[in-house]
A protein has these predicted regions:
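Cell wall/extracellular polymer interaction/catalysis modules
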Residues: 2-88, 92-95, 100
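Exported/periplasmic cell-wall-interacting domains
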Residues: 3-5, 22, 40-43, 50-55, ...
């Protein structure tokens, strides 16, 4: 009986060992596939000097009050100083697309306030536009005049915007 118990225990060890080896192989193989997926997706490869992927056309770093324009993974303008939403009116973070543009937009929400060179990218009227980069906004990304003109000229409807 003791001999039979030892053989059964040996089989269990071999089976457990094979199962562990198989699980490890599957895990490592999955990691390799996952890595390839990230690389193909582009969100793994960031544009140098920015927190954004090479697919982004406009990139914003809220923590450092900076923004960039990017084309084919290369910075074409920036970093430039910006301001963004203040407390309770934060600029949304995430991946967005340019929805529409209006060179002479006026705010329906804030007493017809001018929002020149507006490039809208998020629900709720959130846009890049000319504004004082020293003052917080109601959620938009304020750019100085020359930068607002450049953002307006460079970005097209459907372009990817990343806000970090």
């Amino acid at each position: 009986m003791a001999r039979h118990a030892r053989r059964a225990e040996g089989r269990r060890r071999r089976i457990t060992g094979f199962a562990a080896a198989g699980a490890l192989t599957a895990l490592l193989g999955g990691a390799a596939l996952t890595g390839a997926a990230f690389a193909d997706d582009g969100h793994w490869n960031h544009t140098d000097g920015t927190p954004c992927s090479k697919h982004a056309r406009a990139c914003v770093d809220l923590a450092h009050n900076q923004a960039w324009l990017i084309h084919d993974g290369e910075v074409t303008r920036g970093p430039v100083g910006i301001s963004h939403g203040g407390q309770g009116k934060e600029t949304p973070t995430g991946d967005f697309e340019v929805q529409w543009k209006d060179k002479d937009h006026r705010s329906a929400e804030f007493n017809d306030a001018p929002m020149p060179y507006s490039v809208f990218f998020a629900d709720g009227g959130i846009a890049f536009h000319e504004g004082n980069p020293q003052n917080p906004s109601a959620g938009c990304v304020h750019l100085g005049h020359d930068d607002a003109v450049a953002w307006y000229a460079d970005l097209e409807v459907g372009d990817e915007v990343e806000i970090h």
